[in-house]
Amino acid sequence: MFSTTTNNIEGHPVREYLGIVTGEVIVGANLFRDLFASITDIVGGRSGKYEDVLARARKEALGEMEAEAAKLGGNAVIGVDIDYEVLGQNGSMLMVSASGTAVVI
């Protein structure tokens, strides 16, 4: 499965547009609280633990989006956009969402 932020894949013309596909992942409060308590690896203002959690959430959201594209018969997703949104009363949750257009190339 190809996924790209661009609207085309050079050398692979789009044969069919199948529609918008999405994937969402929500990281809950307990995870962030646990990470806050154990931030001992901050180097230069960065936390490896937070970055790992965000990377996993992003990968899962992209995976869900690609799985939805495959269910529609697509073999690529173009125009991919990844968004992050804080949710909950105290900003206790983070949603990572990926969206794009499923296509056949």
Curated annotation (Swiss-Prot):
InterPro entries: UPF0145_dom_sf (IPR035439), UPF0145_YbjQ-like (IPR002765)
Record Pfam families: YbjQ_1
Protein name (database record): UPF0145 protein Sala_0338
Family in the record: Belongs to the UPF0145 family.
Bilayer-crossing regions: none
